[in-house]
Design a protein with these regions (language model features):
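C-terminal and late-domain segments of enzyme folds
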Residues: 20-52, 63, 68, 77-79, ...
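Hydrophobic h-region of N-terminal signal peptides that target proteins for export
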Residues: 10-18
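Catalytic-core regions built around general acid/base machinery
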Residues: 105-108, 129-142
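ATP/NTP phosphate-donor binding region
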Residues: 46, 54-105
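Glycine/threonine-rich flexible loop motifs
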Residues: 119-128
Length: 269
């Protein structure tokens, strides 16, 4: 009787574990802190996006409307000639973003890059629409999601500097939600160059379950299979309130090449 009971338990436990594995995204993230995009970072993005066999989608929506070319042209630093197909996806209208026709290019996408600018513009256009769901689908099926500056911040679940009134406001009511490709995270950029490191502290104090990530310029965090690795020139600051102790620094640095397990929040060898 005991063995039969154990067998029945396994019938329930094993499928549940497999379901968890199946639901994990198969894709990758390239979260870039702004400034120079190094050869190492862009080469890795192209590789993960399948290069000549891939389809790059460029999303310039965080840019302003002053320079129309920035909303219609893929920038040269992404080396679009390395991809088999390239598309630009942009609208300011959530109603358009919620249509089947608008998301058609995303059905074959292997790589998405979000531009810099102001992150609220991207979230106002796409959050809660079919486009946002299609972005997630690209990531879940194995594509790479990349972005720099504002395009880094939108990849977190909590949106910092999302206020239309100004990017010095870290928490703005009505503009607190990112796409959540990296769950339970808040992502800042230009961290060291612009002396922004302390700006993340009140965010994590208010929302201690979040992992705070502050990335410097010319530096990126690659996320693959639950592991984060630092690429580029400088470093990434990590804020984990669950490990804060009185009198100790509120963040520590991941240096170039270091790896970090996101589930356990531990450095990897």
């Amino acid at each position: 009787m005991k063995s039969r009971t154990l067998a029945l338990l396994w019938l329930f436990v094993i499928p549940s574990a497999r379901a968890g594995e199946d639901s994990a995204p198969k894709g990758h993230l390239i979260i870039h802190g702004g400034g120079q995009l190094t050869t190492e970072v862009i080469d890795r993005f192209i590789e993960l996006g399948r290069g000549a066999e891939g389809h790059l989608i460029y999303v310039p929506t965080s840019n302003g409307d002053e320079d129309g070319k920035s909303l219609t042209t893929v920038p040269g630093y992404l080396r679009p000639e390395k991809f088999g197909k390239v598309s630009v996806l942009h609208t300011r209208d959530p109603k358009i973003a919620d249509t089947d026709g608008f998301i058609e290019p995303l059905k074959t996408a292997t790589a998405i890059w979000f531009s810099g600018g102001r992150q609220w513009r991207t979230m106002d256009a796409y959050l809660g629409t079919k486009t946002a769901a299609a972005f997630q689908a690209v990531y879940r099926r194995g594509g790479v999601i990349g972005g720099s500056s504002a395009g880094a911040t939108v990849q977190g679940s909590f949106l910092v500097r999302g206020a239309p009134a100004g990017n010095q406001i870290m928490m703005a009511e009505g503009h607190l939600e990112g796409f959540g490709f990296l769950p339970d995270s808040a992502i800042d950029q230009h961290a060291i160059v612009r002396k922004r490191l302390d700006d993340m502290i009140p965010v994590i104090e208010t929302h201690p379950h979040l992992l705070g990530i502050a990335i410097d310029e010319a530096t990126a965090l690659e996320v693959s299979g639950g592991c984060a690795r630092v690429l580029g020139k400088t470093k990434v600051a990590i804020f984990d309130a669950q490990r804060w102790k009185k009198g100790e620094p509120r963040y520590f640095f991941l240096e170039k090449g270091q790896r970090y397990a996101l589930a356990t929040r531990q450095l990897l060898p």
